[in-house]
A protein has these predicted regions:
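Bacterial N-terminal signal peptides that target proteins for export
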Residues: 1-9
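Extracellular "leader-to-stem" segments immediately downstream of a signal peptide or signal-anchor
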Residues: 2, 20-184, 195-209, 215-220, ...
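Bacterial N-terminal signal peptides
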Residues: 8-17
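Non-cytosolic beta-sheet module surface loops
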Residues: 89, 119, 281-282, 312, ...
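Extracellular beta-strand-rich solenoid/capping regions of secreted or surface-exposed proteins
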Residues: 117-119, 173-187, 195-211, 217-234, ...
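Right-handed parallel beta-helix
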Residues: 185-187, 192, 206-217, 231-241, ...
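Extracellular beta-strand/beta-solenoid scaffold signature
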Residues: 219-226, 240-242, 262-269, 285-299, ...
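Extracellular beta-rich repeat passengers
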Residues: 349-481
């Protein structure tokens, strides 16, 4: 009987060991810029607490056109199953705390100056105390991935040659004026705990990858990881400043995070590229978070089949989403087959009316924008901006001709909770360059569904009035369901 009980107990312990969650943390290397505003600890359920180092990362604070650099914090870890997190604010008393995106419903408890919560899935979060969004903690809770000790392990795991692995293990690397170029059939591996001061470029390459949970930070005005004139590229896991994709095809960006603080700090640009996908990405930027442009910066052509799924956008200036504007007026280029799905927009703070719009399509240069879907997008209360800015326009600062038209745009399950959004704009340009086929389905403003048959709407009112959307000239077939 005792032997049987011992066996059962042993099997239970083995079962717990097999199925218990795991946590992997990465000590920050000497030389990397750190921030002591927060102390972060994490543990698997019932496990030992581990400290997570916090890096210093600049963000942009705008005020009436003036830009001030603020110092926020960044921390990351990998885990499986479920983890408990403690975030302690070291700079004073904590009166209020929240974890965003709010849609993730992260329940918190406050013990003194420590914010406590649990996670059961990978998330990119902002921990904010006392309403301060500029000295916050960006916390990236990653899904666990294999940790490779050397280039040989990477090569074996990916079925490639060791000489084609550019390996950066834990440590600090200052590239000076140099950069990392990733060529065809090569992999750049940036391990957790690695900090590269510099930038990397996938240039005229095919079947290339940039992977790993480490940091690539130029620490100056520069794109961190670029994909240029390339095909069949994967970027998976890093933290950096910007990830533009230009003149490329079949590019996948996933589990990547970008934070910028300088002028022209767009997060994830698409220039004249096709078949580009983004999944589980985070952008906090000092310019547009996500853009889709045609001819621009020596990249030539239109864009089709662009997909963004599971993203967090935070625009400290300019747009969370911006489409159109730039093209070659002689080519009548097209942007089409675009989907944004499952997006949290945490901020827009833009004083200039021309550049407001959490979701903006401002097409110029004879571009036609058509066949797009924006679905399951949640917008927090923004500081300054508008929800929708769809205009066939002629922006003489950046364009050489008006846009060709905006057609067949579906916006489904879009919600906004707040009071600071300005009047939205939907306008065409003339009888030939129109805006048409804009279909809102289940648009909700502060919980109220806006639709053509909504109760209490006088028959002579436009439905758009209840969403504070101005529908201007040369705009046709705008519906609310």
């Amino acid at each position: 009987m005792k032997h049987r009980l011992f066996t059962l107990l042993f099997l239970q312990l083995v079962s717990l060991a097999l199925f218990a969650g795991t946590v992997t943390t990465y000590p920050a290397p000497s030389g990397a810029p750190l921030n002591d505003d927060f102390t972060v600890r994490v543990r698997a359920t019932g496990g030992l607490w581990q400290t997570v180092n916090t890096y210093a990362w600049n963000v942009d604070h705008t005020n009436n056109g003036r830009h001030t650099i603020e110092k926020s914090s960044v921390a990351y870890f990998d885990f499986t199953d479920k983890v408990e997190v403690e975030v302690t604010w070291n700079k004073g008393d904590v009166k209020t705390a929240r974890v965003r995106p709010l849609s993730k419903n992260i329940a918190t408890t406050l013990h003194g100056n420590t914010v406590c919560f649990s996670l059961n899935r990978p998330l990119d979060l902002s921990v904010e105390v006392n309403g301060d969004t500029y000295h916050n903690l960006q916390l990236f809770a990653n899904a666990a991935t294999p940790v490779y000790k050397n280039a040989g392990q990477v090569a074996k795991a990916l079925g490639m040659k060791k000489k084609d692995v550019l390996f950066y293990g834990p440590g600090y690397y200052d590239l000076g004026n140099d950069s990392i170029r990733v060529g065809s059939n090569q992999v750049l591996y940036v391990a957790g705990g690695a900090y590269i001061k510099g930038f990397a470029s996938v240039w005229q390459a095919s079947h290339a990858k940039v992977i790993g949970h480490g940091i690539v930070n130029p620490e100056r005005q520069h794109e961190g990881i670029m994909v240029r004139y390339s095909t069949d590229v994967v970027v998976d896991g890093p933290i950096t400043t910007q990830i533009p994709v230009g003149g490329s095809e079949r590019v996948s960006v996933r589990n990547a995070k970008v934070i910028s603080w300088y002028g022209w700090g767009d997060g994830m640009n698409v220039f004249a590229s096709n078949d580009v996908t983004y999944n589980h990405v985070f952008c906090r930027t000092s310019d547009d978070c996500s853009t889709i442009y045609c001819t621009r910066k020596d990249y030539h052509g239109g864009c089709h089949n662009i997909s963004v799924t599971d993203a967090v956008y935070w625009a400290d200036v300019a747009h969370p989403i911006m489409i159109g504007l730039h093209g070659d007026i002689e080519r009548n280029e097209v942007i089409e087959q675009v989907v944004y799905d499952d997006i949290d927009i945490l901020q827009q703070r833009e004083k200039q009316i021309d550049y407001q719009g959490c979701i903006a399509i401002n097409n110029g240069d004879n571009i036609t924008v058509r066949n797009m879907t924006f679905r399951n997008i949640r917008i927090d209360d923004i500081d300054e901006g508008m929800l929708f800015n769809f205009r066939v326009c002629y922006n003489r600062k950046y364009c050489h001709a008006p846009g060709g038209g905006i057609h067949d745009i579906t916006l489904e399950n879009i919600s906004y909770n707040g009071s600071h959004a300005n009047l939205s704009l939907l306008t065409g340009y003339n009888e030939q360059r129109t805006l048409s086929g804009i279909h809102f389905k289940n648009l909700r403003i502060n919980g109220q569904r806006i639709h053509d048959k909504m109760p209490g709407k006088p028959g002579w009112y436009k439905t758009s009035d209840f969403a504070r959307i101005f529908i201007g000239e040369h705009a046709e077939n705008v519906t609310f369901e």
